[in-house]
């Protein structure tokens, strides 16, 4: 029946992962302290994205951009994404997890405890999981400490783990 289908769908991990966490105030944000905020969609890291990042950052190391040499000489038998490309995708992946409303603005504050676990091989798909590790009210400014993990599809070890810090200026 349609009700059973809806019930099963709404309980599935895939459906839950597609739902954004919506936050409208500091108090709502604080209510997630220590709790998971969600999981982004999978995102493919292809050679075009890697080449564009290499051009933007002037980092054209062969392990990232020389497909033929990587096939012949790299232990991965493929090019790999720049570690900082994986990090640079964090804002996009974060936006897929959380929607923060009633803002004047949001500012990236910093990163802590960042570790690259393993390289992202070209053509791999990544996604991010996040939870609120800490939160502070700094005279009306919300400082959120987000514990994140960027995982690689089919791999046990993550590509990147760390703590992102954002300042949210609520209206």
What is the predicted function of each stretch?
Residues 19-108:
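Hot-dog-fold acyl-thioester-processing enzymes
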Residues 1-18:
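N-terminal amphipathic/basic-hydrophobic helices that include classical n-h-c signal peptides
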Residues 18-32, 120-171:
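HotDog/MaoC-like acyl-thioester-processing domains
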Residues 95-99, 119, 135:
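Alpha-helix capping at helix-to-loop junctions
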Residues 1-2, 47, 157:
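Generic alpha-helix initiation/capping and coil-helix boundary signal
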